Amino acid sequence: MFVIKFGGSLIKNPETIKKIFKEIENLDEFLIVPGGGEFADLVLKYYETHNLNLKISHDACILAMDIVGMILSNFTKIKASYELKKNIIFLPSKFLFNSE
């Protein structure tokens, strides 16, 4: 199985996303893990400028990964899911929050 980290910054370019997904869709088994992109960057900025709590900032960055994953699912037939299984865009928040 391929585990693919899909950088959140890629959501700026829909054509690139479509090309990447065209290749991924040909794989037999994969798991896509989205990055947080600009959403996570904004959380980190607020962490620094607004003196946010570290745990709250960390959790918000995980939620940013979910947001990017949902946006990515718009460009492919691959479904976004909170369930850790093959051939999905993994939304990690529930898995990570439940493991704390």
How does the language model describe each region?
Residues 1-100:
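Nucleotide/pyrophosphate-binding catalytic subdomain
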